[in-house]
Amino acid sequence: MASFSILSIFKIGVGPSSSHTIGPMEAGARFCGLLKGILEQVERVQITLHGSLALTGKGHLSDEAVLIGLHGIYANELDITTKKALLHEAFENKVLKLANQHHIPFDYAKDLIFDNKPLARHQNALILKAFNAKNEVLKEETYYSVGGGFVYTEKELDNLSEEGENESVAYDFSSAKELLELCQKHQKSIAEIVRLRENALKNHPDATMTKIYHAMLECYHNGANSKERYLPGSLKVTRLAPSVKTRLEKHPTSGKDPLALIDYISLYARSIAEENASGGKVVTAPTNGACAVVPSVLSYAKNHLFENLSQKSINDFLLTSAAIGYLYKKNASLSGAEAGCQAEIGVASSMAAGGLAHLCQATTQQVLIASEIAMEHHLGLTCDPVGGLVQIPCIERNVLGAIKAISASKLALEDEYKPKVSLDEVIATMYATGKDMNEKYKETSLGGLAKTLKC
């Protein structure tokens, strides 16, 4: 496998979930690649969603996502017109155009199986099988959607473990302690270390972050200006961002309320989280369920803290945030199904706090402290999406995650602040807490608000 790019913490895709929408779509598209040379022999495909993918798959659109993927389409390539046409063919005409080349019959009730039992390797798993006319299996593969849109086969997961032992990447780091030592050794910021690492891998950090930033802006614009009154699904949740935007345009907050800026932070976060919930184009940061925290904190900095924030500074914020996200992916989890919402909103808040601290001229140590504080106060946060939808409590959690990130950054910048807990320690604690958490509270919609709220 190619060396992991820290830049991939941010991915352009579609809502409402990175693990349950982007991941299954990629699995379907990758499975098409395995059918080269035997595609014309395929008469039927069978999809089995396991664990959290089965329990919340319909609300998270996992079923639709894998069907789109089986047409050979990835999330960053999908447009709404194509999506509607493919799903109409699958659900109404009962036909799939496998790999966008070969038509096969499709029966949703028989060919798409929801198995609530998780596989041993991860809570988010799906098995894809292709059969010939004799009902013999031509090809079979198991995929694990481990959070943040990252998808691996069994073999790839094994290789990930081996890479950690065998592969050497310039300017790489496995812990916050190693990252701090790198920054001190080379007299570089976290963002500069990430640039050096990604350039060594022949990637394009600044061009990529600029593209990511503009995708975030587009998502905000679409959410803030949506003409839809309600989000999709049975909950009939009202899209509030457009009305908040209209109110703030007509009656900008005055200096009388020292906390008035919270309204703007809420607008930024709500716009993006609501657009994600509607299945729109979004950026994983590090997941779809937590996609609004990082960009809303960045918008707060750009629109209210700094005049004329340069594109380089914006990229620095994103690269710093990505480095923090990388530490969680490497040493813990980005999956609500594996570690609860602390692995999504908690990680996003930690990332945003570090990025903002960097913009505020923090030392590397202070950046890491800010990230630690933000996660420390998300520990134990459950993932209990009501109705299997990424709406309640997800949208408002993005707002509060952004506010916590800003508060954490300010705390870390106090000169006399002497932390007792390191970022590495809080990452380990988050993962251990997630492993101990009851499965009802890990993206199954079997406990918490999902159980209490009748919908």
Curated annotation (Swiss-Prot):
Biological-process GO terms, alphabetical: gluconeogenesis
Matching SUPFAM superfamilies: Serine metabolism enzymes domain
Tagged with keyword Lyase: yes
Co-factor binding comment: Binds 1 [4Fe-4S] cluster.
Pathway as given in its UniProt record: Carbohydrate biosynthesis; gluconeogenesis
Gene3D superfamilies according to UniProt: D-3-phosphoglycerate dehydrogenase, domain 3 (3.30.1330.90)
Disulfide bonds: none
Record has Lyase as a keyword: yes
Catalysis performed (reactions): L-serine = pyruvate + NH4(+)
Cofactor(s) this protein cannot do without: [4Fe-4S] cluster
Pfam families reported in the protein's UniProt record: SDH_alpha, SDH_beta
Keywords: 4Fe-4S, Gluconeogenesis, Iron, Iron-sulfur, Lyase, Metal-binding
E.C. numbers: 4.3.1.17
GO molecular function terms attached to this record: 4 iron, 4 sulfur cluster binding; L-serine ammonia-lyase activity; metal ion binding
Family: Belongs to the iron-sulfur dependent L-serine dehydratase family.
Protein name: L-serine dehydratase
Lineage: Bacteria, Pseudomonadati, Campylobacterota, Epsilonproteobacteria, Campylobacterales
